[in-house]
Amino acid sequence: MFKNTFQSGFLSVLYSIGSKPLQIWDKKVRNGHIKRITDNDIQSLVLEIEGTNVSTTYITCPADPKKTLGIKLPFLVMIIKNLKKYFTFEVQVLDDKNVRRRFRASNYQSTTRVKPFICTMPMRLDDGWNQIQFNLSDFTRRAYGTNYIETLRVQIHANCRIRRVYFSDRLYSEDELPAEFKLYLPVQNKAKQ
């Protein structure tokens, strides 16, 4: 999808405020919902994914199962709200051995397991809004001893609220981020005016 796109800085794949936030995503919903709501904490539109079973309610990108993202930027950043329920997400990458590997992080697992094609790991979320930063290059090297080439697919499962999902060439400090990539809490906004 993005293979022939010049990639530097930031590449956003989901922005909850956009006119069609799920334009390049496919939705799967069973016993749950995926909808845009206004989050009280940030007074802004967010995407809520809720379901009784994390494995049956999710969004996946790209929408076409035969396509891949082709994103070479090594950092995946997600701005996610902790709903104090089970939550998991998965990223599929391609390494320099031409092998597709999956990384699955979840808040209900306690140990990391590395198998040939999937690495599952625990993730701890703070209360409220979190910025999850995932160094795909580092994880690929540490789990498999290979080099990260590109991201093929991202899948975000219930239960969470999403503000933005993007890739970047490196980790940026809060001051370096473009305004629309920051998560402003209303209290911070008032202090800055």
From Swiss-Prot:
Superkingdom: Eukaryota
* Compartment list: Nucleus; Cytoplasm, Cytoskeleton, Microtubule organizing center, Centrosome, Centriole; Cytoplasm, Cytoskeleton, Cilium basal body; Cytoplasm, Cytoskeleton, Cilium axoneme
| Record keywords | Cell projection, Cilium, Cytoplasm, Cytoskeleton, Microtubule, Nucleus
Q: Does the keyword Transcription regulation apply?
A: no
Q: What does this protein do?
A: Cilium- and flagellum-specific protein that plays a role in axonemal structure organization and motility. Microtubule inner protein (MIP) part of the dynein-decorated doublet microtubules (DMTs) in cilia axoneme, which is required for motile cilia beating. Involved in the regulation of the size and morphology of cilia. Required for axonemal microtubules polyglutamylation.
Q: Do you know which PANTHER family this protein is assigned to? A: ORF PROTEIN
Protein name per its UniProtKB record: Cilia- and flagella-associated protein 20
Instruction: State the encoding gene.
Output: CFAP20
